[in-house]
Amino acid sequence: MARILGVEVPDNKALFVGLTYIYGIGRKTALDILNNLEIDPNKRAKELTDDEISRLSHHINENYKVEGELRQEINKNIKRLIDIGSYRGKRHKAGLPVRGQKTHSNARTRKGPRLTKIKKR
């Protein structure tokens, strides 16, 4: 397996799919990166030369926020929303949906498992 930015990219998959294993890179971004570097997107990771791997790593590192850096920025943004006391921050803190979804009957993923009530006889 080729190692790009600390992430194992699978050898048996097309390179544009393999790059999506890196947090912050989707298919479109992967194709853009490969087109900029003039690397065949359907090439397998095991067929990459050391030079191509270093070019990929350098290009991604210079032009994109990925992995830990991206996660830190997202967490920092959420913390900022909580600190300023915005509605979105309060929803994050309470563990409820942030983007206006209804919560009366749904939102189980965000709210967690149901708390069962003890029935009176």
Curated annotation (Swiss-Prot):
HAMAP family: Ribosomal_uS13. GO terms for cellular component: cytosol; small ribosomal subunit. This is Small ribosomal subunit protein uS13. Gene3D superfamilies: 1.10.8.50, 30s ribosomal protein s13, domain 2 (4.10.910.10). Part of the 30S ribosomal subunit. Forms a loose heterodimer with protein S19. Forms two bridges to the 50S subunit in the 70S ribosome. It holds the Pfam family Ribosomal_S13. Residues 101-121 have a biased composition (Basic residues). InterPro entries: Rbsml_uS13_C, Ribosomal_uS13, Ribosomal_uS13-like_H2TH, Ribosomal_uS13_bac-type, Ribosomal_uS13_CS. SUPFAM superfamilies: S13-like H2TH domain. The keyword RNA-binding applies. NCBIfam families: uS13_bact. Transmembrane segments: none annotated. Residues 92-121 are annotated as: Disordered. The keyword S-adenosyl-L-methionine does not apply. Located at the top of the head of the 30S subunit, it contacts several helices of the 16S rRNA. In the 70S ribosome it contacts the 23S rRNA (bridge B1a) and protein L5 of the 50S subunit (bridge B1b), connecting the 2 subunits; these bridges are implicated in subunit movement. Contacts the tRNAs in the A and P-sites. It comes from the Bacteria. Keywords: Ribonucleoprotein, Ribosomal protein, RNA-binding, rRNA-binding, tRNA-binding. Belongs to the universal ribosomal protein uS13 family.
